[in-house]
Amino acid sequence: MAILGLGTDIVEIARIEAVIERSGERLARRVLTDAEWAHYQQHQQPVRFLAKRFAVKEAAAKAFGTGIRNGLAFNQFEVFNDELGKPCLRFFAKAAELAEQMGVRHVHVTLADERRYACATVIVES
C-alpha cells in the first residue's frame, strides 16, 4: 500500500449555521447523499452533522488532488459508520471513476468537532 493522497479540512460550525439560516436546506441538499439526508433530518444536532460531513468531503476532494470541481460534487462522497462507529467513505459517479483511475483501494477517515469547529482528514491508499 502507498499513500496516494492526503486531505484535511476545518469548518467553522457557525458559518454552516449562518448559511442554513440564509438559504434554508439548500446547502444540506447539495452536500448530502440521500442516505446522509435521512440521518441529517433525524439528528439531534443537524448543523454539527452537516459541518462534519462537509469537512470530510472537502478533505476527500483534496486527497484526490482536485478539490470540488470539474464534475466532482459533494454528494458523490458518502460518509457512513461501520459496525464499530468508525467513519468510512463511499464514492459515486465522478468520484468513483477518479478513485478507480487513481487505484484507490483503502480510505482512512478521521473527523472531530469541538464547540466552534469540525475538522476531518482523509487518506487514500493504493
UniProtKB/Swiss-Prot annotation:
Mainly localized where? Answer: cytoplasm
**Subcellular localization, per the record?**
Cytoplasm
Family per record: Belongs to the P-Pant transferase superfamily. AcpS family.
Which cofactors?
A: Mg(2+)
Top EC category:
transferase
* Annotated source species: Pectobacterium carotovorum subsp. carotovorum (strain PC1)
Give any single GO term for biological process.
Answer: fatty acid biosynthetic process
Write the protein's name.
Holo-[acyl-carrier-protein] synthase
> Encoded by which gene?
acpS
Q: Which UniProt keywords apply?
A: Cytoplasm, Fatty acid biosynthesis, Fatty acid metabolism, Lipid biosynthesis, Lipid metabolism, Magnesium, Metal-binding, Transferase
